[in-house]
Every structure is written in C-alpha cells, then in structure tokens.
C-alpha cells in the first residue's frame, strides 16, 4: 500500500477493524510528502447527489474524533464552509444542492446577500465587484484539517500496531 492518505488510512482500518497487520506501506518518497501534504485542507459533505453527500458525510463523522482516535492532533477545525453565489443561476443551483443535503440529514444553510455581508463584511459587495455576491450556501460543520498531520498520525498508529512502513 502507498504511503499517502488513502494508503495509510487503509492500513490503519485493516489493522484496527480486522486485525490485519501483515501489510506493508511502500512509499517511494516520504510519508506525508505527496498529495496528502499539498491539498486544500477543506473538509465538507456539501454534495448534490445522494450517494456523494452520504459518502462524504460518513467521512465528516470520522474527522470529528480522529485526533483522539489517533492520539495525534490533526488540527481539525469545523469552522464552516461558505460557497459564494455570483449569479442568480448559481444561487438557485446552491439552493437545490442545499435542499438535497438537508433531505439527507446534512447541515446546509442558504444565506442571502445580507446574511453573507454579516459573516464576511470585508468582501466586495459593490455593484462594480468583479465577482458580485448574490448569496451563499453554508455548511456549518465544514472546516479544515492538516492532512499532512493526518498522514503522520496514521503512520504512527499503524507502526505501533505492527504494520511495516518502508520509505
């Protein structure tokens, strides 16, 4: 298994849930040096399609206790995520997505222009703004985490469980 986020998580859950530890992480570089250390750090489950939303929502639930589970601070911060709508069409699309999310039990809040202005007062709300703001879709539980910290947390745990790491 490779030493990126997916590989490390796979090795961890194989060891934790199924007691399978005769697994080797083979990483051509270094743990946390690939995409897992360079991505956007955004955590969300704000997807339109049922299967996608529910899949990512399951991941959101894992993030909530991951620092405690790994005994490693992954710097999870559920500060919310706001997707700005820059046209009436985009606002309607976000309303549709938000409705789909709520039907699946996923948190979603539509914000009008004034609601966005209260939350992001420094944004350009002028008539001449390059990207005018019509409103937004907010997922209050969305947030960020340090994905490279997640890689190191998984690596430390699987090493202690007997999984071999070769880098």
Which stretches of residues belong to each language-model region?
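Glycine-rich FAD pyrophosphate-binding loop
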Residues: 15-39
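Short loop/edge segments at beta-strand edges and connector loops
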Residues: 27, 112-113, 167
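Helical element adjacent to the flavin cofactor pocket in flavoenzyme catalytic cores
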Residues: 137-167
